[in-house]
Amino acid sequence: MSGPDLRRAAAARALDLVEPGMRLGLGTGSTAAAFVALLGERVRAGLDIVGVPTSEATRAQAESLGIRLATLDEQPELDLTIDGADEVDDRLRLIKGGGAALLREKIVACASRRMVVIADAAKHVARLGAFPLPVEVNPFGLKATHRAVEAAVAGAGCSGDVRLRAQADGKPLVTDGGHYILDARLGAIPDPEALGAALWAVPGVVEHGLFLGIADAAILAAARDGQAEVTVLGSLT
């Protein structure tokens, strides 16, 4: 069973949580895109919801599927956000931001009554950190901020390197908000809360990809005997 099949299985389970009239946060990334695709099918069948996208890519996909959209200013309180994750641990702490949408993803998730993560079960880890931690930064004073982020990482008991994320042409990747991304390749994060606090203390940091105390549940899909087996961390209610 392929990765797309597992993503679709997790997304299908999340779709069961959607009720008519809901205000939904729509995540970013391949697994979130699978959910948006299924949501579009339900909308075409008559489901009435409004979605708030977390990126321009998600906005474009949702619009192409006929999903009614609003901005977060128009719908500042959401019922549910469905989004993917790069890593999730047993305490529902996440690393997100591989798709460079972490700032909007976190804003939307925190404006929601509930956030549910959907992912391939391979994203479930004992300790966060194998996936590079994205840190969104202001372009102004980039070198100074880069050095300060490296110091913050070391001060939080982590080791590794911090690299500016680049596009294929070698130029810095620019987020939808006009910021850059520093990827902290740490291997393991012994204390995510300490690292999050240390990164927040750096003036040039706009947001980091540690989502702590935000997710209510994670729907994880794994291949078993040629079928998708879906399990849940946390509570879906």
UniProtKB/Swiss-Prot annotation:
GO biological process, one term: pentose-phosphate shunt, non-oxidative branch
Protein's UniProt keywords contain Transferase: no
Sorted UniProt keywords: Isomerase
A Gene Ontology molecular function term of the record: ribose-5-phosphate isomerase activity
Pfam assignment, any one: Rib_5-P_isom_A
Keyword Isomerase listed: yes
EC number: 5.3.1.6
InterPro entries documented for this protein: NagB/RpiA_transferase-like, Ribose-5P_isomerase, Ribose5P_isomerase_typA_subgr, Ribose5P_isomerase_type_A
UniProt pathway annotation: Carbohydrate degradation; pentose phosphate pathway; D-ribose 5-phosphate from D-ribulose 5-phosphate (non-oxidative stage): step 1/1
Active site annotation, chain numbering: 105
Function: Catalyzes the reversible conversion of ribose-5-phosphate to ribulose 5-phosphate.
Similarity comment: Belongs to the ribose 5-phosphate isomerase family.
Subunit relationships: Homodimer.
HAMAP family: Rib_5P_isom_A
Protein name (record): Ribose-5-phosphate isomerase A
Organism the protein comes from: Methylobacterium radiotolerans (strain ATCC 27329 / DSM 1819 / JCM 2831 / NBRC 15690 / NCIMB 10815 / 0-1)
Taxonomy of the source species: Bacteria, Pseudomonadati, Pseudomonadota, Alphaproteobacteria, Hyphomicrobiales
